[in-house]
Amino acid sequence: MFGRNKIRSKQDHVILLVDDDKGQLDVFATWMAAVRPDVHVRAAATVEEAINLINAHTFSLIISDYSIPHAGAGLNIFEAAVQSGIPKSNFIMLSGTTDNLPDEVRLVSKGDLVALETAIQQALV
């Protein structure tokens, strides 16, 4: 009740990455291990899987594709994250488009690793 039963990793920071493209998940996990070896990365390939993980675990940061599998589905993950208590600033949406995104969603263009690394560092301070 009230998140007390959520599982916390032994690492200081746990990041959830959500993308329906397995190749993107693999590339991100490899990149993250090189850039931030102090974090533990969990991955989800569907909206349902992501929401189940959000309900069962505590995450420091959630990074989600906007179009998983269709445009806007990432907003369902954003809503679940906010309901779980994660600050809106600790949610990053990856997208090639900015259409229909609420102002409170932090957007990083897919493939812009410099901007993504900056956003991750700001969220994990």
Model-identified regions with their sequence ranges:
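Acidic phosphotransfer microenvironment of two-component signaling modules
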Residues: 22, 45-49, 114
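Non-catalytic signal-transmission and effector/linker regions of two-component phosphorelay proteins
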Residues: 1-16, 99-125
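Acidic, metal-coordinating helix/loop segments flanking the phosphotransfer/catalytic sites
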Residues: 29, 43-61, 69
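Conserved phosphotransfer microenvironments
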Residues: 63-82
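Two-component/phosphorelay signaling modules centered on CheY-like receiver
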Residues: 22-42
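Structural signature of beta-strand start/N-cap positions in the alpha/beta core
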Residues: 14, 40, 58-60, 90
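Conserved acidic carboxylate
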Residues: 18-20
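A short, hydrophobic beta-strand element within the central beta-sheet of small alpha/beta folds
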Residues: 78-100, 108-109
